[in-house]
Each structure stands twice: as C-alpha cells, then as structure tokens.
C-alpha cells in the first residue's frame, strides 16, 4: 500500500463535523441594540449560570438567548461534509415523535399524524423479524393506525413512480436534443450535500427531479389536509427511510410555491430507530403484539388494508405499496433505458421492434459500479450507470471536473497527477477489454448516472437494521435484498404498462390543478453551491471531522 494511502482512506463513511462554524443569528433589533445602545459589551455568567451581555458604558445587562442550529442551517453551511449528529438527534428522533404524540393527547390539539414508509425499510424490518413483506406490512399498519393513533399510512410507491417517470421523460427530452451528458441523479441527499459543498462544478449536471420521500410528502399532506378539513400545518408527516441523510433532505427549504412552503416531511426515522422506539416503549407499542398471528393471517387482502389506511383520494391505491424494476435504490438507471426503448418503439414503429432490443451490463472495477447499455442489435442507443459508494463517486466527479483552459498554467504537481491518472486509466482499459473495444464501464460517458452514497445502494442504507452477531453482513444484505425483490411489482418500464404510466401522469396533472400546486413545487428540487469559509477560525473548526 502506498505511503500516502491509509486504510482510513478506504472507508466510505464520512464522519459528521465535531464543531459547527455557523455563527448564531441575530435579528436586526438585536444588532441595533448591541451596537448603538450598549456600545462595547462583554459576556458574563450570572449566579444561576445564565449568559448576560453587559455594557461597558452604563453596565446595562441583557439576557442572551441560546444559539440554535437547525437542519436548514446545516444545508447552507460548508463547515463539515455532513450534518452535526446532535442536530439530527434533536430534531428528527423517536423521542421527538413520542413528544409530539404526547402533546396531542395532553393539549387535545388538532394535529393529525400520517406516515409513509419506503420499500427498503419494509425489507429491512421483514428481514429482522423473519416475516414476509405482506406480514410486515399488516403489522406496520396495525402499529401506526391502531396503536399509535395515526390517521393514514402509505407506501412511497406513487411518489417513486412519479419520480421515475419524470426523471425518464426529462432524460428522453435531453437525449433527443443531443445534450452533453451525463445527467446525475439527486435522490440521495448524502451525495447532493457532498456535491454542493465540495464539487459545485457538477451541480449543472444534477437532475432536479425530487425524491420519492419529498413527492410522497407533498401528496400526503395536501390530500390529508383537504379530506380532514385542516391546514397542512396541522398534518404531522413521519417518513420511515433507509438512510439518516434523509433527515437533512426533509429540512431543505422549498423554493417553489409561495402558498405551500411548509416542510412536506416533519420527522424522518430509519428502520433502526423505529426498532429502538419499540424497545423503549414496549409497554405501549408492539410491532409483534400477542395477537400478531391473527393480524398476519387475517382473511382481509392486504390490498384492502392499503386502501383502508390511505386517504380516500390516494391514487392507484392497489399499487401504492408496489415495487419497481431495476436496482434496490429505485431502479432509476434501468427505468430510463426501458422507457426510452418504449419511446422509440412508439415513435418509430416501423424502425424498431421490441424483440430487437436488449440491455447489456458492463461491470466496473468493483460491484458498486455498473454500466447498462440499451442495444438494438449491435447499435448502442443509450446508456446509464449505477455508482454506489464514496470511492466510486470520487472517481466519477474527478472525471467530470472541467479541463484546464488552453494557455492556463498548472503546477508541476498537478501535471504529475494528471499524467499518473492517464497512465492508470490506460492500464485499466487495456487490462479489462480487448484493444479497440468499448467494454470498460465508464459512468462519465453515460447519458445518466444513478448515484447513491452507500455501498450497495439504498438497501444497505446506514439506517437499516444491523445483522445479529452470528450472521455476516453479506448474508444479511442478501436476505434483505431477497425481501425487497419479493415486493409485488408494477413494472413501469414494461410496454404493457404504458397506459398506467399515462394514468399516473394524468392524475398528477389533475392533482396540481385542483390544489393549486405547481409542477415545480411537487416535482422539482434545487441546489445551492455552498461557499467555503474564508476566516481562519472557521476553517480550523470545519476541518476537525
């Protein structure tokens, strides 16, 4: 191993910052008072431990309020790569959920609780409790509706299908205009934060289509509020997700829709945290209650339960917990290729026949890098890639870094690095493919890249339940993947489901018209290049991670 490369460099996990560099905010009144009334001041602690601001001119004392850092602050800060752990725990924890539930009872408030749960979280829970997907779904519905008092619980399938369809349609439009790829997915908040804070030059390539979590949140809050005759602010939306970074995504401020700027998700818990909640409050809540056998063996079809626990106007309720084809992160890369195939068949029926298409899989240097190529005979028509894990992401963004303009000077070290990379790249190509062939996976040359920060993608998210001591991580992951793949499928990419795709999109348009929700508000996100700190103190604090 090279002297400049240690084992620590191979770890995909990015530790949170131990110190926050964001200064406490002051409103204009506070600033005016401090500067103009008190003049020069000093901070002292009184006998009760409270901070005081004391004027050196007249001795006037002013109580200081505690500084608070929110998740939205973390999104706008470059002090650390990911969020401060304390912020996540404080604002998105099972304790906060229990606190909110108790406040509803104690204060007799009008707050209504609703929940959505991801495919990967269901698979993780089913694996941990050794149950089928249908059994775990029935028990989850019983837990949230009958025990915790939630009004609705839905799967994230409709939100994901809207995300998949819009992603594919946007790519097809770009493809036909001969765009300069690749487009990079943005449904992984860990990857998005990394790009915003460290590689802003890739932001123009990022897809602006929202993730299933956020689309589901907008639909669920809007429909629930309308049916119950309350405001969106009266709806408390809990989302069960496979990844802790989803907490940060839920806090990203809405840029579109002046009338609906409130968060679509109020609390994000992972499957791991849900288990912790159940362990700490086993006297009140049980996923596996004494009558569990009666619940799981009920003669009521699970599809009827999906309908019963969803808002009355929830779309395509029979498919609202269904799965999608492709990877266990949602299948974005695969669905783009298949939908583009369907587009070509419908647009050029005499030129393209379904039986002439195939998808070739080209492996990369490791199992977390795969390229998929849509072929018609021997002709490559489109391509996408799956890039999982921080190391593969780093390699991709290096390749996408803008080249140095002609005439500009570069340091000797940079030139040496460039030559070294070129040698390495050339060696890899020669070793993995015959001379002159195009068999080496290269995500940077694809139309689209499905990017997830976690190795193995969302099914292996940091919030998934850990394996028992006697089970290897590899076997546990395989078991979770098997559960995930057992979720009933509604394959949007299948030619026979083209009408279903049209139905989903038509319903989306009607929803936006009826409730005055713009297309951007429902479906589009945005990115922000985070400026790096320039003062030495902030740089020093931000570097300690």
Swiss-Prot record:
Domain of life of the source: Eukaryota
Function statement: Component of the cytosolic Fe/S protein assembly machinery. Required for maturation of extramitochondrial Fe/S proteins. May play a role in the transfer of pre-assembled Fe/S clusters to target apoproteins.
Listed GO MF terms: 4 iron, 4 sulfur cluster binding; iron-sulfur cluster binding; metal ion binding
Pfam families xref list: Fe_hyd_lg_C
Gene source species: Scheffersomyces stipitis (strain ATCC 58785 / CBS 6054 / NBRC 10063 / NRRL Y-11545) (Yeast)
Family label: Belongs to the NARF family.
Entry protein name: Cytosolic Fe-S cluster assembly factor NAR1
Residues reported in the UniProt entry to bind [4Fe-4S] cluster 1: 20, 74, 77, 80
Residues binding [4Fe-4S] cluster 2, per UniProt: 188, 243, 454, 458
């Amino acid at each position: 191993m090279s002297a400049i490369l240690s084992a620590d460099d191979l770890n995909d996990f990015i530790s949170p910052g131990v110190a926050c560099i964001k200064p406490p905010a002051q409103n204009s009144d506070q600033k005016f008072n401090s500067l103009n009334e008190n003049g020069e001041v000093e901070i002292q602690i009184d006998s009760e431990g409270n901070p005081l601001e004391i004027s050196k001119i007249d001795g006037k004392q002013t109580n200081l309020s505690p500084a608070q850092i929110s998740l939205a602050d973390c999104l706008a800060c470059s002090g650390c790569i990911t969020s401060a752990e304390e912020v996540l725990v404080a604002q998105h924890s099972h304790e906060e959920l229990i606190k909110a539930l108790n406040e509803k009872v104690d204060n007799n408030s009008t707050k209504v609780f609703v929940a959505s749960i991801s495919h990967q979280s269901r698979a993780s829970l089913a694996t941990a409790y050794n149950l089928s997907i249908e059994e775990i779904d029935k028990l989850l519905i019983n837990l949230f509706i009958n025990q915790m008092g939630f009004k609705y619980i839905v799967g994230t399938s409709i939100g994901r299908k809207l995300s998949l369809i819009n992603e594919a349609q946007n790519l097809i439009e770009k493809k036909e205009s001969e765009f300069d790829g690749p487009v990079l997915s943005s449904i992984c908040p860990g990857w998005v934060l990394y790009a915003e804070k460290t590689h802003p030059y890739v932001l123009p390539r990022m897809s602006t289509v929202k993730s299933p979590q956020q689309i589901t949140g907008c639909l669920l809050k809007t429909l629930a509020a309308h049916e119950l005759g309350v405001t969106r602010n009266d709806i408390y939306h809990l989302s069960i997700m496979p990844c802790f970074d989803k907490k940060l995504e839920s806090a990203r401020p809405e840029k579109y829709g002046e009338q609906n700027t409130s968060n679509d998700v109020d609390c994000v818990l992972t499957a791991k945290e849900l288990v912790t909640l159940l362990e700490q409050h086993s006297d009140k809540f049980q996923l596996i209650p004494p009558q569990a056998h009666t619940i799981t063996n009920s003669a009521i079809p699970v599809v009827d339960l999906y309908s019963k626990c969803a808002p009355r106007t929830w779309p395509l309720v029979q498919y609202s917990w269904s799965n999608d084809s492709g990877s266990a992160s949602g299948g974005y890369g695969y669905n783009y290729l298949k939908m583009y195939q369907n587009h070509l068949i419908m647009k050029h029926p005499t030129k393209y026949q379904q039986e002439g298409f195939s998808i070739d899989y080209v492996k990369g240097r490791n199992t977390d890098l795969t390229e998929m190529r849509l072929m018609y005979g021997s002709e490559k028509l489109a391509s996408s890639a799956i890039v999982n894990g921080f190391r593969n992401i780093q390699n991709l963004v290096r390749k996408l870094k803008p080249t140095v303009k002609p005439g500009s000077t570069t340091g000797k070290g940079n030139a040496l690095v460039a030559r070294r990379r070129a040698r390495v790249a050339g060696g890899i190509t020669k070793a993995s493919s015959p001379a002159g062939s195009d068999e080496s996976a290269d995500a940077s040359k694809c139309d689209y890249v499905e990017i997830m920060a976690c190795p193995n993608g969302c099914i292996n998210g940091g919030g998934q339940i850990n394996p028992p001591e006697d089970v290897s991580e590899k076997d546990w992951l395989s078991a979770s993947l098997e559960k995930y793949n057992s979720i009933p499928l509604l394959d949007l990419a299948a030619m026979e489901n083209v009408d279903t795709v049209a139905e989903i999109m038509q319903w989306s348009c009607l929803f936006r018209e009826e409730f005055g929700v713009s297309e951007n508000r429902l479906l589009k996100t945005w990115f922000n290049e985070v400026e790096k700190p320039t003062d030495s103190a902030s740089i020093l604090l931000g570097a300690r991670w």
